[in-house]
Amino acid sequence: LTVAQPFRAAGYHTAYFGKWHLDGYQERDGRAVFHRVPRPRRGGFDTWLGYENNNAQYDTWLHGHTGEEEVEQHRLERYETDALTDLLLGHVKERAADGAPFFAVLSAQPPHNPYVAPAEWMGRHTPEGVQLRPNVPAVDWVRERARRELAGYYGMIENLDWNVGRLMETLRARGLYDQTHIIFFSDHGDMHGSQGQFLKT
């Protein structure tokens, strides 16, 4: 049973956009973004436009289906979070027009290493201006790397927040905001130098 199935059974249109990371593909077999997830393993969503795994926010490829129609693999034309949000917003507008209830998931990989957001967001934070946690050891290379990574990480978070705002504005404009539940969560954080460690917590 997947989350899509009870919603579909209750009459909701279900959609998934973004990182899947459930098909068990290993990078040693090639770049995971080019692994095609077979339709039976796409969670039973009515619309599924995603990829198995990917760590290149400016080189993201999607494939999947909309209804019965298969969607061939294609490259997103801009930064992953912005492009995936564009897809979600288009979907919300379609659902608002047909009046049917819907359940949609947006699974954006950022914030994730490499910590590079669009320039307008990267420019908001400089490594020199980043405050480190008290548990980051006084080791020059650790502190330099932590500051550099956090500057990009913060830019990615602000970009994601801006995209959530775009979703909320679209829901309001379509009269759906008061009847829509938005659930936001993350699968992990990063250490950014805490106890001298980096990457996933």
Place the predicted regions along the sequence by residue.
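Formylglycine-dependent sulfatase
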Residues: 1-201
